[in-house]
A protein has these predicted regions:
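Pro/Ala/Gly-rich low-complexity, hydrophilic intrinsically disordered segments
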Residues: 1-27, 31
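Residue-level signal for short, function-critical loop segments
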Residues: 29-31, 76, 169
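Short, solvent-exposed loop/turn elements at domain surfaces
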Residues: 31-37
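Signal peptide-proximal N-terminal region
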Residues: 44-70
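Extracytoplasmic/secreted proteins, especially bacterial periplasmic and envelope-associated proteins
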Residues: 49, 53-56, 82-86, 106, ...
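Beta-alpha junction/loop-to-helix N-cap segments that form part of ligand/metal-binding clefts
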Residues: 64-130
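Extracytoplasmic ligand/sensor domains, especially the bilobed periplasmic-binding protein
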Residues: 100-171
Length: 171
């Protein structure tokens, strides 16, 4: 992916109609885990933080006058398994206006493949990975090199100075 191939859209200025939209969220709460597992589950903390942000975004969307119905499903994700295929089939997600999630790229691709014929946009919320491509699959996080190029171009264009703070753990 080249920087010039990346499109950015300000969705707050792109309100197209007043018709009600159905948004589906696939979030790995993994609610079937035992309470002792949940207490030490870092992945659950990520899911809950993400969910908190989603609730704020929904509130902002409604403030902007967007009519949305939101359905939230526990995708029961781990690196080895998920419930996304079952959720898509049982809940007839081919009629959704958009699906956000799941978290792991392999399951995002699975959902995108299942909904590709219906042209339902599937949005990968957290993954930077790129694997299989589908016309209905959208990555929300650009690749590192695109982000770096855009930041450097901005800094060059504004004669900005660069101060680097580097953690030896993540070099």
């Amino acid at each position: 992916v080249k920087k010039e191939d990346v499109n950015f859209t300000n969705l707050s200025q792109k309100k197209t109609s007043s018709t009600r939209k159905e948004l589906v969220l696939l979030i790995p709460f993994n609610a079937s885990k035992t309470p002792t597992d949940i207490k030490k589950d870092a992945f659950l903390n990520i899911s809950l933080d993400y969910y908190s942000g989603v609730l704020m975004a929904i509130d902002s969307a409604k403030t902007l006058g967007l009519n949305i119905d939101v359905k939230i499903f526990d995708s029961q994700e781990s690196k080895m398994s998920s419930d996304v295929a079952n959720i898509v089939r049982v809940n007839n997600l081919k009629n959704a206006d958009a699906v956000i999630g799941p978290f792991y790229q392999q399951y995002v691709e699975q959902v995108a493949e299942m909904l590709n014929a219906s042209k339902v946009p599937v949005i990968s919320p957290l993954s930077k990975e790129t694997g299989k491509t589908f016309d209905n699959l959208y990555q929300t996080i650009p690749p590192n090199h695109v982000t770096k190029d855009i930041v450097f171009d901005y800094m060059k264009g504004n004669n900005a100075n660069i101060i680097a703070v580097i953690s030896p753990k993540k070099v």
